[in-house]
Design a protein with these regions (language model features):
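Extracytoplasmic "Venus flytrap"
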Residues: 26-44, 59-63, 167-170
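Ligand-binding "clamshell"
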Residues: 90-100, 105-121, 185, 210-212, ...
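Beta->alpha turn/N-cap motifs
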Residues: 60-64, 74-87, 104, 165, ...
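Short, polar/charged alpha-helical segment
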Residues: 35-54, 176, 180-182
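An extracytoplasmic/periplasmic, membrane-proximal ligand-sensing/linker region
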Residues: 36, 167-181, 258-305
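A conserved helix-loop-strand patch within extracytoplasmic ligand-binding domains
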Residues: 102-161, 269-271
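Ligand-binding pocket segment of bilobal, Venus flytrap-like solute-binding proteins
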Residues: 156-235
């Protein structure tokens, strides 16, 4: 799918319609080190700056533990996080709430506010969780849209070979959980185990049909999925936790900028899983576009808050 028209001159427009704020301290914006972290962190930076907020750029600060530690210690003021990670932050992995988008969001929002004085703003309607992606030609020919469809296809004897990491193949909450929920079982001849956990490698293997592979371990919003001709399968039974990205801001900072939630809400609301977020990730991971420039490919200027 072609990305919607690049909005041009929207920052200039926003500069006119947005009143600069005369607030105390600059807002320190951080993110995780991965592609999507860079993208979302830069989007937050852009929205705040378009409303006259002075910022400090700490995008791509580090891994989840590093960034999480930075915001709880006050080193960061705002960063994008995933709702499902609340299960691990608060050691509550068995609560079924994490497998429901709204329940998981409300739970992590409540816990973080109470324990850390962190406020979760409106999340994007996307899910960056473990999934299986199949080649689009296979998906279209066999009407594969969900993991339930995959279970049906495999029972019918459909040709299938999955590229995945050993962790995905072996972890009880990964492939085995999908097999149990959707009533299928892959044998060794249907699996290609690749070293590490890099989905870029598994997706590339499926795109190039390496060793007969036509499917790959992936994350729901992986950029290369659509760009390399693959399609993610939905998880209608909610086997995996929902990992919806959302801005997380320190309570004291939100008091200084009470409109921050209103500014960011329409932007994150526009980041739907397949039409926008995958394509924006692809513009970085596949096209090599700088994350700062990829921000400008958001669908419409009016969505910039």
């Amino acid at each position: 799918m072609i990305i919607s028209k690049v909005w041009v001159g929207s920052l200039a427009l926003l500069a006119v319609v947005s009143m600069p704020l005369q607030a105390a301290s600059p807002v320190t914006v951080g993110s995780k080190i991965d592609t999507e972290g860079a993208l979302l962190g830069n989007i937050i930076l852009q929205v705040l700056e378009s409303h006259g907020v002075k910022t400090v750029n700490k995008v791509q600060l580090g891994t989840t533990p590093v960034v999480r530690g930075a915001i709880t210690s006050g080193e960061l003021d705002i960063y994008p996080e995933y709702t499902g990670n609340g299960a691990f932050f608060f050691k509550d992995e068995n609560d079924p709430a994490w497998k429901n988008a709204s329940a998981g969001y409300e739970k992590v929002k409540k816990l973080d506010a109470e324990k850390n004085k962190l406020v979760w703003l409106t999340p994007a309607p996307a899910n960056n969780t473990w999934t299986i992606a199949v080649r689009q030609d296979v998906a279209q020919k066999n009407k594969l849209e969900s993991l339930a469809d995959l279970g049906r296809y495999l029972k019918e004897g459909g040709t299938f070979k999955l590229a995945a990491s050993a962790e995905f193949i072996e972890r009880a909450d990964a492939l085995p959980a999908f097999e149990k929920a959707y009533d299928f079982k892959l044998n060794q001849n249907q699996l290609l185990s690749l070293a590490g956990g890099d989905t870029a490698v598994t997706i590339k293997a499926a795109a190039q049909q390496t060793s007969g592979v036509n499917a790959a371990m992936a994350y729901g919003t992986d950029g290369p999925v659509a760009a390399l001709g693959l399609q993610t399968l939905s998880d209608p039974k909610g086997v995996q936790p929902i990992y919806a990205p959302a801005p997380v801001v320190r309570e004291s900072v939100l008091k200084d900028y009470p409109q921050m939630g209103e500014w960011l809400q329409p932007v994150f609301a526009s980041l739907d899983e397949k039409k926008t977020l995958q394509q924006l990730n692809a513009s970085i991971a596949v096209e090599g576009l700088d994350a700062k420039k990829s921000r400008s490919r958001l669908p419409e200027a009016k969505r910039m808050g």
